[in-house]
């Protein structure tokens, strides 16, 4: 009987940890999505930011990678924001004017 109780207790604890682990990961995903939406709202509604098409942003990103040692491109890359929505894979690229 002691073995049965131990096994039952162990399985209950494992099930609880499994449910807790799943719940924590979904909360993390929700928090990340909230952060992304807040970031998009901050930059999309700001008239000082210009949003680029995906192709324009790819070209800009490749220029930044090629000129890593250039201080001008470094300051440019710090002003560019790449926001990704992991659910529907849409992208927004915004750059400060």
Curated annotation (Swiss-Prot):
Keywords: Cell membrane, Lipoprotein, Membrane, Palmitate, Plasmid, Signal. Pfam families: DUF5425. It comes from the Bacteria. InterPro entries: DUF5425. It is a lipid-anchor. To B.burgdorferi BBD15. This is Uncharacterized lipoprotein BBF20. The lineage of its organism: Bacteria, Pseudomonadati, Spirochaetota, Spirochaetia, Spirochaetales.
């Amino acid at each position: 009987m002691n073995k049965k109780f131990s096994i039952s207790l162990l399985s209950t604890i494992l099930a609880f940890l499994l449910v807790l682990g799943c719940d924590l990961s979904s909360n993390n995903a929700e928090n990340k999505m909230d952060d992304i939406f807040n970031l998009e709202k901050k930059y999309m509604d700001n008239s000082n930011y210009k949003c680029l098409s995906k192709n324009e942003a790819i070209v800009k990103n490749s220029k930044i990678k090629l000129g890593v040692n250039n201080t001008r491109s470094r300051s440019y890359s710090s002003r560019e924001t790449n926001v990704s929505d992991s659910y529907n894979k849409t992208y927004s690229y915004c750059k400060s004017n």
